[in-house]
Amino acid sequence: MNTNDFDFELPEELIAQTPLEQRDASKLLVIDPVTREMTDTHFDHIIDQLNPGDALVMNNTRVLPARLYGEKTDTHGHVEFLLLKNTQGDQWEVLAKPAKRLKVGAKVSFGDGRLTATVTEELDHGGRIVEFSYNGIFLEVLESLGEMPLPPYIHEKLEDRDRYQTVYAKENGSAAAPTAGLHFTPELLQKIEAKGVKLVYLTLHVGLGTFRPVSVDNVDEHEMHSEFYTLSQEAADTLNSVKAAGGRIVAVGTTSIRTLETIGNKYDGQLQADSGWTNIFIKPGYQFTVVDAFSTNFHLPKSTLVMLVSAFAGREFVLEAYKHAIQERYRFFSFGDAMFVTRPSEK
């Protein structure tokens, strides 16, 4: 498989720069790979795609305001950090700019010294391990000094940082939002639950690798980034019961899919309480063990996310659906519109 097999022309003006005023007013393209039907609707009608007895699985990770601007304490040169993951205690892996000036022992000050960082290790590609010093609670300091790490294709300033969080965001740790969940409102979730659909939450902390382009021609040579996930016993029990009763597991977004499939692969299609790191790469040829349907946003050309959707619904049909979405002026990427995909079934 060649990376170019997942390429398509996307007019730049279709890349959504800001969220819509109303979360669930976004458009929704419903696609069925069996009948090859495509239906244009709006996201608040996703409830029509869900049946009593189904489970809707959402990722409740919360995006940290992980972009910090500071200065070196010796030269006062400007420094930018992007927090990637907490390695232990007050140590973090960060992406640093300009990295070449930040050798082991270098000190960086943020917010007039309210937060300082010392470089303890140099990594590849501008990565550094740093140890933070501060007074009080780290997350509170970060909330006051940090900025939301918006994706590189969004150039507008975000007026309300809550719009880059899902309404059910709870567990701190992501460098990017699980954007398929941005469309849900508390009212819509209430209606879905009232219909008899189980609402189930898991956690996968989204890393920046989610935006990393595939830089190799041969898809099989691409190395996926690792991300940390957690599924509780209560959630696993609910999902196993839904499956056993003939209900569908409907995932919200690729992060939920990757978590569920990682755990399902470990336990022969069953779900158990589990946490750990996953670098699962779902591409055409992959056999799904857990997920029956899902919603997702429209993704970047040649990305692993387009490959995942293609594994589920077939590459040619997915590219047809993307062509339709472009013709109908759907909005793309993080603040864009959504797609609902039902799984080809032989039942």
UniProtKB/Swiss-Prot annotation:
One of its GO terms (cellular component) is cytoplasm. Pathway: tRNA modification; tRNA-queuosine biosynthesis. Its main location: cytoplasm. Coiled coil: none annotated. It is an enzyme of class 2 (transferase). This is S-adenosylmethionine:tRNA ribosyltransferase-isomerase. It comes from Streptococcus thermophilus (strain ATCC BAA-250 / LMG 18311). Transfers and isomerizes the ribose moiety from AdoMet to the 7-aminomethyl group of 7-deazaguanine (preQ1-tRNA) to give epoxyqueuosine (oQ-tRNA). It is found in: Cytoplasm. Monomer. It catalyses: 7-aminomethyl-7-carbaguanosine(34) in tRNA + S-adenosyl-L-methionine = epoxyqueuosine(34) in tRNA + adenine + L-methionine + 2 H(+). It comes from the Bacteria.
